[in-house]
C-alpha cells in the first residue's frame, strides 16, 4: 500500500497571488494579441510558488513563472478575461497535446498526434526553439474569476503554449464566466509535437516540488496538463455560463523533468434555439483552457474508501478533503479543487439542449499510467484519457461533471484517483475517474464519465501511441495514447446535427478514449462543492491487463437530486467510420487489448437519475438520489451523431434509486477484464420528429414528477459479474442506449421500467458479430416518450460469482414492477422484464454490444395488449483496426465496436420475445415507438435451421452470409431448398444395353426384352412372351368378375407362378391387362434362366396339365384353357427383333431366346449373330463344316461346274489352232520363184518398141511441161510426178505434138524398156545395168 505523503502542492495563497493579476487586467482591443514574455523567462512555474498570471502592468509572472513575448499583448475584442486567462494558462503549458482533434483539423495532425503521444510517453524534450511563442497572460475582470481565484491552482508550471487554432467568443447577455480563445496554430505543427527542453523543465521546477519528487521510489516530474475544456460558444453572441469545467492533468516522467502543457483539447457546440443566443464552442489542438471554479462552494464531506485486493496486495483509496487551505498532513490536491472542476452550461429553453461540459484534472502517476479525464459533451458523457506516465508517486485525478440548470449550475465535486505502485511489474490498472456534480436548489443535474467522444459529425482517432517498455519488469501502459478526433459542424468547428426540422442544430464534438496501464491505482475522491454526500471510490488491480475502474458518486443537494455515471466513450473516425483502437504493449509481450468504439445514440435524459457502474474486480458501491425538487430546471443536452458518419456513443441506461431504496451488490473475484461503463441520462425536452440515416435520439417534452424509469442491462465480465440495482425517480425522457466498450462488459442492475402505452412495439435484434453496421438504422418518434426496457445480456464465463441485486422502490414513483435476474450461471442468463402500465411512450435506442462469451440468453418482455410484433434487425459490428488485440483469459481477440439501432414502428404492440443467443450473438427485447426505421436490412433469423427448410432429406446448415442457412442436398436433388431433381441419366449410370429413365429423385435402368438386370448387368434370360385377348364369352365370367385390372393381373401372375414353379430356372411371370370396350388384352411375360433349356413346348405342355387339374381360380383356369396355345412361337421375335438377315437367317424364339437361325447352306460362328455365312468358293457345308468341292466343281456349296467346261474347251480349241497353222505353212512353201517382169509382160498385149535400134539419149533436162526433178543425195533417184504422165488412148497420138516435142520422150513404166502406156515405145531413161534398174524398180 502506498504510504501517505506530505502535500506536494503550493498553498492556496500562492495561487491567489498568481490569479490576482488576471482579475485586474482589462480586456484588450480586438484583434490584438497579448505580448509574449521573453524567451529568457521560458521556465516552469515553481510548484511550491504561487501561480499568478501577469496583470496589466505585469509583464512577467511571479517567481519562476516563465513568460514569453509574442506579437502583441492585446486581447481581441469581445474576448472575455476568461479567454485571456485560458490563453495564459495554455501558453504556459508545454506538454504535448494529446486530445481529440477538432473537426477542422486535418488528418495531417493525426500523425503529429501520434508522435506527440510517443513523445509524451517517452517524455522526449526538445529545444526551446521548437515551442511556439507563448501569448501573455491576460487578466480576467469577471466576478467569477475572483471567486475562482479563491480556488487552489496547483503546480501550474510555466505553461508554454504553441500556436493553435484561434477560437474567439464574444460576450453575450448571459453571464459568461469565460470565453475561450486560443491563438491560431500553424498547420505544420500538431499539438503532439510541442516539446520542452530539459533546461526549461528544470529551471521552472521549484525546490519544494523536486523535494517531493525525490521522495518517490522513482524519480519523476509532475506534468501539469490542461486536459481540455468543453466550451459552449454561441453562434451569434457566444456566451458561457458559469462553471466551465477544465481538466488538468499532471504527469510524471522518469526523466525527472516537469512538463506542463495542454494534453488535449475538446470542442463542443450546442446551438440553442433562437430564444437564447446560440452558443457553440470549439477548442483546437494545443489549446488548453483552465477555468477556475466558483469558490462559493467550499463545504466538502468525507468519502467512503473501498479497498480491493488483487494478487494479495491490498489497495487503499483515500478520501481527500477539499478546502480552501490544503492540509499538509493529508495527501491531497486541494489546489486543483477549484481549477479543474468547473462546469459550463448554457441557459436555454426547455426545447433545446443545454451545453454542458466537464473536465477533469488528471494526475498521471504510477508506472506510466495515469488517467486524464476529459470533458463531458452534450451527451452528458465525460471521457477519460489514459496515458502512460513515469513512475508514480500517487496519482490524483480531478473529475468534474457538467451541470445543467438555469444558469445556476453549482461547482462540481471532483474525484481524485491516486495510484500507488503497490503491485509489482507486470500489473497495471486503467482507472476511471469519479465525477460528481452538484446543482443549486431547484436544479437537477446529471453527470457522467464519458469516454472521449468525437463529434457527431465524425471522430478521428488518430493517435495510437506505442507504449514504451519500462525497466524493472514493469509493464508500460498505453502511454499517452489518445484518439485525436475531429468533427465537422455546419455552423461551427464541431459537428452539428439537426435534431429537429424546426429545432436549431446541435453540434457536438466527442473526444476519443485512450488507455494506460498502471501497476496499481488508489482512487481517492475529493469534493470541492457544498452539500456533497458520499462518494465511493473503488480501486482495482489487474495483473498484465488494464482494468477500467468505474466509479459512481451521488451527491445530494438541497431539494435537488443528482447523480453521476461513468461510461466508456467510443468514437469513430469521421471519414472512415471505423472504430479506432488503442493498443497496449508490455515488456513481457502480453497481448494488447484493443479498445473498440461503438457509435451510441444518446437521447435526452431524465432530469434526475442515478447510474451505477459495474466493473469486474471492483466493488461498485451504492448510489442514491433524492427526488428532484424542481425537475423542470434540469437541463440535460441531448445530442445526435451527425449523419455523415457513425458516431461514438456510450452505453447509457437511466436508473435511479429513490430515497429509502437499497441496493445490494456482490462482485465476483477480481479478473483482468476491462469493463464498459453505463451512462443513462434523462432530459425533459420535446422535439418534433426528426429522422436521420444515422444514430439519433428523440427528445420528449418535460413532465415533472413523472414515474421513475429504469432500464436493465446485464453483462458479464470474463470471470466476474456485478449487478448493481438502481432506480430512478425523475421525469422520464429519453433513454440512452447501453454501450459496451469491450468484449468484457459490465452489468447494470435490472430496475423498474415504465413501458410506453400504445406506441411501442417489440423489436428483436439479432446481431452476428461480423456484420457491417449501418448508421441509417434509426427511428424517431414525435410526442412524449418514456424509455422502455432495454435489456442487454451478455454471457458470463464459468466460475462467476453472481450478485442478485435487490431494489426497493419508493411509493412515490409510478407503478412499475421490479425486473429480476434469474439463473446467473455459467452458460445462460435469463432476464425477465415485466413492465407495467406505461406513462410516456419513448423511443428506446438499442445498443448491440459485442459479446465474446458463449451461451444461451433469453430475453422476454411482456406487454398488456395487442399481439406481439417483432422486427429482427441484424446490426453490424466492425472489428477494430489492425494491430490491436484484446486479451481475455489469456486469449487475444479482436473486439468489435457495438453499434446501436433505433427501430421504430407506427403500430405498437405488447412484447413477448424470446431469442436464443448462441456464441457471439445478442438478442434484445425492447419497445420502440412509431415511425418505421429507415433502410432496415433483411432479417436473418438466429437459427434458420430450427424448422428445416431443406426438402427431400436435405441437411440444413446455418450460414450467416446468405439467407442464414444453406442446404446440403442428397445426390438426387439440387437447388437452394433441394427441390430440383437431378437428371442422373445425363451421366449414363446404366450398364450397356440398358435404357436410363429419370424419375423424381432417382432413375431406373431398363434392360431390353429378353434381358434382365442382375448385379448391374443386363444378362440374357429365356423370355417367353405372349399376347392374347379374351373372347366375349369370357367377359362375363372373368373380366367382369374382376373390375379392377390390377386384381386380374395379380391373379393371372399368381396362377402362372404356381404353374411354372416346378420348371428348372424359373424366375417369374408378369401380366398386364388392358381393357377395351368389348375385349380385354392380356400380355404375359415369363422368364427363365438361360441355363434352364426350357422351350416353348415345355411351357405349353405345363399350362395344359395345370389347366386340366386347375387348383386356382376357375375363371383363370378357364381363361388359360380357352387359349389353344398361350405362348406361341414368334411372339418374342415380334417384340424383340434381333434384326436377323432375312436372306441368310430367320428369327426363332422357341427356346425363349430370340435368335437368328441360318438357312440351309449357311452357318454361324456365334449363335447370337444376326446373320449367317456360307462356305467359301470351292467348299461346301457338310455337317456344319465347309468341305472342298470335287474336281471341276466350284461356287456355293460346289454347285458351279465352270472348271470342267474350261478344261474341255481349252483342249479342243488348242488342237484346232494347231492344224490351221500347219496348213498355212505348207501353202506358203509351194509358191513360184519367177521374175516379176515375166509376170507382168506375160500377156500378149505387150509389144516391143519400134525404136529398139535408137541409141541412148542423155537425160533430158525437161520432161513435159514440168521438169522432172532429179537429184542425188547419196543415191540417185528419179522422181516422176504422175501429173507429168499423159495417158493417151492408143492410136490417138498427135504426130504434130510429137514433132514439136510436146509429148514426153518416155511414158512407159520406169523399169521397162518399153512404155506400158504407149506400147512399142522405147524408154530413153532405161539403164541396162542392174544397179540402175534397182533404183527404178
UniProtKB/Swiss-Prot annotation:
| Biased composition regions of type Polar residues, renumbered to the chain | 118-131, 195-206, 247-258, 283-296, 340-361, 576-585, 592-617, 725-742, 751-763, 897-909
Name the keywords, alphabetized.
Calcium, Cell junction, Cell membrane, Developmental protein, Disulfide bond, EGF-like domain, Glycoprotein, Membrane, Phosphoprotein, Repeat, Signal, Transmembrane, Transmembrane helix
Membrane topology reported for the UniProt record? Single-pass type I membrane protein
Q: What range(s) does the EGF-like domain occupy?
A: 941-979, 981-1019
Cytoplasmic topological segments: 1226-1337
Q: What does this protein do?
A: Receptor component of the CCM signaling pathway which is a crucial regulator of heart and vessel formation and integrity. May be acting by stabilizing endothelial cell junctions.
Q: What is this protein called?
A: Protein HEG homolog 1
Query: What organism does the UniProt record list as the source?
Result: Mus musculus
Amino acid at each position: 500500500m502506498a504510504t501517505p505523503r506530505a502535500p506536494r502542492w503550493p498553498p492556496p495563497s500562492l495561487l491567489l497571488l498568481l490569479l490576482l493579476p488576471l482579475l485586474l487586467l482589462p480586456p484588450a482591443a480586438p484583434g490584438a494579441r497579448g505580448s509574449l514574455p521573453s524567451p529568457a523567462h521560458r521556465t516552469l512555474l515553481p510548484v511550491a510558488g504561487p501561480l499568478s498570471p501577469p496583470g496589466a502592468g505585469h509583464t512577467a509572472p511571479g517567481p519562476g513563472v516563465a513568460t514569453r513575448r509574442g506579437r502583441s499583448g492585446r486581447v481581441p475584442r469581445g474576448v472575455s478575461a476568461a479567454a485571456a486567462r485560458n490563453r495564459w494558462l495554455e501558453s504556459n503549458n508545454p506538454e504535448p497535446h494529446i486530445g481529440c482533434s477538432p473537426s477542422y483539423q486535418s488528418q495531417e495532425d493525426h500523425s503529429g498526434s501520434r508522435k506527440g503521444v510517443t513523445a509524451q510517453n517517452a517524455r522526449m524534450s526538445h529545444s526551446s526553439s521548437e515551442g511556439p511563442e507563448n501569448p501573455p497572460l491576460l487578466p480576467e475582470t469577471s466576478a467569477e474569476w475572483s471567486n475562482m481565484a479563491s480556488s487552489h491552482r496547483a503546480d501550474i508550471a510555466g505553461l508554454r503554449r504553441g500556436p493553435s487554432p484561434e477560437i474567439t467568443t464574444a460576450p453575450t447577455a448571459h453571464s459568461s464566466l469565460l470565453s475561450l480563445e486560443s491563438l491560431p496554430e500553424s498547420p505544420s505543427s500538431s499539438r503532439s509535437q510541442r516539446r520542452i527542453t530539459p533546461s526549461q523543465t528544470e529551471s521552472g521546477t521549484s525546490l519544494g516540488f523536486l523535494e517531493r519528487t525525490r521522495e518517490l521510489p522513482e524519480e519523476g516530474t509532475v506534468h501539469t496538463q490542461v486536459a481540455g475544456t468543453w466550451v459552449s460558444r454561441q453562434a451569434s453572441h457566444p456566451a458561457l455560463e458559469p462553471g466551465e469545467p477544465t481538466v488538468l492533468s499532471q504527469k510524471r516522467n522518469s526523466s525527472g523533468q516537469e512538463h506542463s502543457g495542454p494534453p488535449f483539447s475538446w470542442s463542443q457546440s450546442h446551438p440553442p434555439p433562437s430564444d437564447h443566443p446560440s452558443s457553440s464552442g470549439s477548442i483546437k489542438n494545443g489549446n488548453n483552457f483552465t477555468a477556475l471554479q466558483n469558490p462559493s462552494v467550499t463545504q466538502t464531506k468525507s468519502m467512503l474508501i473501498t479497498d480491493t485486493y488483487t494478487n494479495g496486495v491490498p489497495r487503499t483509496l483515500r478520501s481527500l478533503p477539499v478546502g480552501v487551505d490544503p492540509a499538509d498532513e493529508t495527501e491531497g490536491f486541494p489546489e486543483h479543487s477549484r481549477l479543474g472542476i468547473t462546469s459550463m452550461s448554457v441557459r436555454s429553453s426547455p426545447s433545446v439542449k443545454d451545453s454542458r461540459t466537464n473536465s477533469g484534472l488528471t494526475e498521471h502517476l504510477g508506472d506510466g499510467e495515469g488517467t486524464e479525464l476529459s470533458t463531458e459533451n452534450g451527451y452528458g458523457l465525460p471521457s477519460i484519457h489514459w496515458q502512460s506516465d513515469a513512475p508514480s508517486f500517487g496519482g490524483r485525478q480531478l473529475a468534474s461533471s457538467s451541470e445543467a440548470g438555469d444558469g445556476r449550475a453549482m461547482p462540481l465535486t471532483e474525484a481524485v484517483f491516486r495510484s500507488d505502485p503497490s503491485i509489482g511489474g507486470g500489473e497495471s490498472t486503467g482507472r476511471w475517474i469519479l465525477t460528481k456534480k452538484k446543482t443549486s436548489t431547484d436544479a437537477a443535474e446529471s453527470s457522467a464519465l464519458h469516454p472521449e467522444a468525437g463529434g457527431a459529425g465524425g471522430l478521428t482517432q488518430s493517435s495510437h501511441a506505442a507504449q514504451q517498455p519500462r525497466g524493472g519488469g514493469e509493464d508500460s501502459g498505453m502511454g499517452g495514447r489518445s484518439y485525436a478526433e475531429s468533427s465537422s459542424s455546419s455552423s461551427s468547428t464541431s459537428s452539428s446535427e439537426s435534431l429537429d426540422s424546426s429545432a436549431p442544430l446541435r453540434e457536438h464534438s466527442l473526444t476519443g478514449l485512450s488507455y494506460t496501464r498502471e501497476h496499481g491505482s488508489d482512487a481517492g475522491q475529493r469534493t470541492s462543492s457544498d452539500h456533497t454526500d458520499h462518494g465511493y471510490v473503488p480501486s482495482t488491480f489487474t495483473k498484465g491487463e488494464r482494468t477500467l475502474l468505474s466509479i459512481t458518486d451521488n451527491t445530494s443537494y438541497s431539494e435537488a437530486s443528482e447523480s453521476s455515471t461513468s461510461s466508456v466513450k467510443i468514437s469513430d473516425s469521421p471519414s472512415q467510420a471505423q472504430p479506432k483502437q488503442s493498443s497496449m504493449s508490455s515488456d513481457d509481450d502480453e497481448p494488447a487489448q484493443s479498445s473498440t468504439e461503438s457509435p451510441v445514440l444518446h437521447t435526452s435524459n431524465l432530469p434526475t437519475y442515478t447510474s451505477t457502474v459495474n466493473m469486474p474486480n471492483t466493488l461498485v458501491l451504492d448510489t442514491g438520489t433524492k427526488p428532484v425538487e424542481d425537475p423542470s430546471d434540469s437541463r440535460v443536452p441531448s445530442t445526435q451523431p451527425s449523419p455523415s458518419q457513425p458516431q461514438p456513443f456510450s452505453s447509457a441506461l437511466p436508473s435511479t434509486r429513490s430515497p429509502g431504496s437499497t441496493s445490494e451488490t456482490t462482485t465476483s473475484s477480481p479478473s483482468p477484464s476491462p469493463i464498459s461503463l453505463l451512462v443513462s441520462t434523462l432530459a425533459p425536452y420535446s422535439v418534433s420528429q426528426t429522422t436521420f440515416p444515422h444514430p439519433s435520439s428523440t427528445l420528449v417534452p418535460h413532465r415533472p414528477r413523472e414515474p421513475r424509469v429504469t432500464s436493465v442491462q446485464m453483462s458479464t465480465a470474463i470471470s466476474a459479474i456485478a449487478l448493481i440495482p438502481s432506480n430512478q425517480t425523475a421525469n422520464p425522457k429519453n433513454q440512452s442506449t447501453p454501450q459496451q466498450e469491450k468484449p468484457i462488459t459490465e452489468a447494470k442492475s435490472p430496475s423498474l421500467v415504465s413501458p410506453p402505452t400504445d406506441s411501442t412495439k417489440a423489436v428483436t435484434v439479432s446481431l452476428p458479430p461480423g456484420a457491417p453496421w449501418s448508421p441509417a438504422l434509426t427511428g424517431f418518434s414525435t410526442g412524449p416518450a418514456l424509455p422502455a426496457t432495454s435489456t442487454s445480456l451478455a454471457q458470463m464465463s464459468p466460475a462467476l460469482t453472481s450478485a442478485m441485486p435487490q431494489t426497493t422502490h419508493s411509493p412515490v414513483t409510478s407503478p412499475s414492477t421490479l425486473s429480476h435476474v434469474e439463473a446467473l450461471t455459467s452458460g445462460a442468463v435469463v432476464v425477465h422484464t415485466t413492465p407495467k402500465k406505461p406513462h410516456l411512450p419513448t423511443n428506446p435506442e438499442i445498443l448491440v454490444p459485442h459479446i465474446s462469451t458463449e451461451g444461451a440468453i433469453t430475453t422476454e418482455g411482456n406487454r398488456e395488449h395487442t399481439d406481439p410484433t417483432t422486427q429482427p434487425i441484424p446490426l453490424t459490428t466492425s472489428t477494430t483496426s489492425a494491430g490491436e488485440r484484446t486479451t481475455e483469459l489469456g486469449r487475444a481477440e479482436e473486439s468489435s465496436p457495438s453499434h446501436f439501432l433505433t427501430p421504430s414502428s407506427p403500430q405498437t404492440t405488447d412484447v413477448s420475445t424470446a431469442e436464443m443467443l448462441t456464441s457471439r450473438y445478442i438478442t434484445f427485447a425492447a419497445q420502440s415507438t412509431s415511425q418505421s426505421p429507415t433502410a432496415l436490412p433483411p432479417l436473418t433469423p438466429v437459427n434458420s435451421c430450427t424448422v428445416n427448410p431443406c426438402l427431400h432429406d436435405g441437411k440444413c446448415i446455418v450460414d450467416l452470409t446468405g439467407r442464414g442457412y444453406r442446404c446440403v442436398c442428397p445426390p438426387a436433388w439440387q437447388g437452394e431448398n433441394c427441390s430440383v431433381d437431378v437428371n442422373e441419366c445425363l451421366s449414363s449410370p446404366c450398364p450397356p444395353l440398358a435404357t436410363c429413365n429419370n424419375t423424381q429423385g432417382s432413375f431406373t435402368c431398363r434392360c431390353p426384352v429378353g434381358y434382365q438386370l442382375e448385379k448391374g448387368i443386363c444378362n440374357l434370360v429365356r423370355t417367353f412372351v405372349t399376347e392374347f385377348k379374351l373372347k366375349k364369352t369370357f367377359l362375363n365370367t372373368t373380366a367382369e368378375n374382376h373390375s379392377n385390372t390390377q386384381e386380374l393381373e395379380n391373379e393371372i401372375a399368381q396362377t402362372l407362378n404356381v404353374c411354372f414353379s416346378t420348371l428348372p430356372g424359373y424366375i417369374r411371370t408378369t401380366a398386364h391387362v388392358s381393357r377395351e370396350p368389348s375385349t380385354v388384352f392380356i400380355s404375359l411375360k415369363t422368364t427363365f434362366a438361360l441355363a434352364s433349356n426350357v422351350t416353348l413346348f415345355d411351357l405349353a405342355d405345363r399350362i395344359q396339365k395345370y389347366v386340366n387339374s386347375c387348383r386356382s381360380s376357375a375363371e383363370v383356369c378357364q381363361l388359360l384353357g380357352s387359349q389353344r396355345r398361350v405362348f406361341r412361337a414368334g411372339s418374342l421375335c415380334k417384340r424383340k427383333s434381333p434384326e436377323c438377315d432375312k436372306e441368310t437367317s430367320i428369327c426363332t424364339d422357341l427356346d425363349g431366346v430370340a435368335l437368328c437361325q441360318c438357312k440351309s447352306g449357311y452357318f454361324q460362328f456365334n449363335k447370337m449373330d444376326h446373320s449367317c455365312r456360307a462356305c467359301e468358293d470351292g467348299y461346301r457345308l457338310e455337317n456344319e463344316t465347309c468341305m472342298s468341292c470335287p474336281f471341276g466343281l466350284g461356287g456355293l456349296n460346289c454347285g458351279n461346274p465352270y472348271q470342267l467346261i474350261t478344261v474341255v474347251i481349252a483342249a479342243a480349241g488348242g488342237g484346232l489352232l494347231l492344224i490351221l497353222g500347219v496348213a498355212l505353212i505348207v501353202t506358203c512353201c509351194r509358191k513360184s520363184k519367177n521374175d516379176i517382169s515375166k509376170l507382168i509382160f506375160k500377156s500378149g498385149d505387150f509389144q516391143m518398141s519400134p525404136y529398139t535400134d535408137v541409141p541412148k539419149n542423155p537425160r533430158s533436162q525437161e520432161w513435159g511441161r514440168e521438169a522432172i526433178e532429179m537429184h542425188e543425195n547419196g543415191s540417185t533417184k528419179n522422181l516422176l510426178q504422175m501429173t507429168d504422165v499423159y495417158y493417151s488412148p492408143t492410136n490417138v497420138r498427135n504426130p504434130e505434138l510429137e514433132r514439136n516435142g510436146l509429148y514426153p520422150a518416155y511414158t512407159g513404166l520406169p523399169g521397162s524398156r518399153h512404155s506400158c502406156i504407149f506400147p512399142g515405145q522405147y524408154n530413153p531413161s532405161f539403164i541396162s545395168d542392174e544397179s540402175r534398174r534397182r533404183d527404178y524398180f
